[in-house]
Amino acid sequence: MSKGHSLQDPFLNALRKERIPVSIFLVNGIKLQGQIESFDQYVVLLKNAVSQMVYKHAISTVVPARNPRATGNPAMAAGATAAPAADEGYGNQ
């Protein structure tokens, strides 16, 4: 499992389990809304009136309607931020 999944998977899973509505912004600017039904390494299944399979490489931002509860994951504890440290940005891979 890569380092990025240690934050991404618990966050998406909490949004899925709690059925929190999300807005997903794509890299081309399109805004999708719904609930995360499922996800894997490459795609997110977003459910609204219909289910849409959205490739993760096309996603810019995931904005939940509310914060998920922290469930034993220190990365999701109150006050924790999702922003990478200065030396952990995507440009340094």
Curated annotation (Swiss-Prot):
HAMAP family: Hfq
Biased composition (Low complexity): 74-86
Molecular functions (GO terms): RNA binding
Function: RNA chaperone that binds small regulatory RNA (sRNAs) and mRNAs to facilitate mRNA translational regulation in response to envelope stress, environmental stress and changes in metabolite concentrations. Also binds with high specificity to tRNAs.
Source species of the chain: Alcanivorax borkumensis (strain ATCC 700651 / DSM 11573 / NCIMB 13689 / SK2)
Pfam families named in the record: Hfq (PF17209)
Protein name per the record: RNA-binding protein Hfq
Domain named Sm: residues: 9-68
Quaternary organization: Homohexamer.
A single GO BP: regulation of RNA stability
GO CC terms, sorted: cytosol
Similarity remark: Belongs to the Hfq family.
Entries under CDD domains matching the protein: Hfq
Region (Disordered): 74-93
UniProt keyword annotation of Transit peptide present: no
Alphabetic keyword roster: RNA-binding, Stress response
SUPFAM superfamilies membership: Sm-like ribonucleoproteins
